Regions:
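Short, well-ordered secondary-structure "scaffold" segments embedded in the functional core
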Residues: 1-244
Length: 244
């Protein structure tokens, strides 16, 4: 149950620059913090295991301040970190990071506006709500790919390529029979199986901070600052002009 008193799902997802959903994890309850929900996902474990390889290739995903900094996950500088940002380099990094992250915001916005079922409360149990979200994302991708001419509309194998993450140990969302829905299961509440040893959280943050610092310096070296904010005015002829 969410803090506002109704049942909901926390849906984690990744997309590309075309706003196609690449990965979806709709198996946490609505009151779960985003960082905790992402930490419950198998994708998070996989990224931790591949941290060194991803770092060598300069690859990472982008998130907002709700997530924890990691070498595979870049997040913006917070207000405390920016207190000594005299050159506005951290602010410039935040601006460009936000410019990348906006694609997922737009993807969710288009998903909601495209399918009228999301314009109101979903009057289904949480298990069915999860399936509805997954199918809507698949159709959303299909429309984008058809629009860009990247898919044969008669190809039935198209929908087999989308990664939908559910629980390994318990494939469906658990609900108590005859009772109000309880917290959604995460791998049946058992420790997740892991592969190679992974770095601890503090080391992970330090490595992430090092990568973020190097990116910040690189942006500053190329003078990629946040664009100046301009004020818009009208002259007597009604023409618009800008002042900084």
């Amino acid at each position: 149950m969410r803090r506002k008193g109704f049942y909901a799902l926390n849906v984690q997802a990744c997309c590309d620059r075309n706003k196609r959903f690449l990965w979806c994890y709709p198996s946490n309850n609505g009151s779960t913090y985003d960082s905790a929900a992402f930490g419950n996902a198998r994708l998070y474990d996989l990224l931790k295991e591949m941290a060194i390889e991803l770092q060598e290739k300069g690859l990472f995903i982008v998130g907002d301040s709700a997530y924890g900094l990691a070498p595979f996950l870049m997040v913006p500088y917070d207000k405390d970190e920016m207190k000594n940002d005299t050159g506005h380099n951290m602010d410039s990094f935040n601006y460009h990071l936000s410019s990348c992250r906006i694609y997922i915001e737009c993807a969710f916005g288009e998903l909601i506006m495209r399918w009228g079922i999301f314009w109101r409360t979903l009057l289904f149990d949480l298990r069915k709500c999860s399936k509805i979200i997954q199918v809507a994302m698949l159709l959303h991708n299909f429309i984008i790919d058809c629009r860009e001419g990247r898919v044969d509309r008669g190809d039935d194998s198209y929908f087999q390529d989308f990664e939908i993450e559910t629980d390994d140990m318990q494939d469906e969302l658990t609900m108590a029979t005859g009772e109000a829905p309880r917290a959604l299961a995460t791998d049946n509440n058992e420790p997740r199986r892991r592969g190679r040893p992974t770095i601890d959280e503090e080391t992970q943050r330090q490595l992430g901070d090092d990568i973020r610092h190097r990116l910040t310096i690189k942006l500053a070296a190329h003078e990629m600052k946040r664009p100046l904010q301009h004020d818009m005015h009208y002259n007597k002829q009604g023409h618009i002009y800008m002042t900084s």
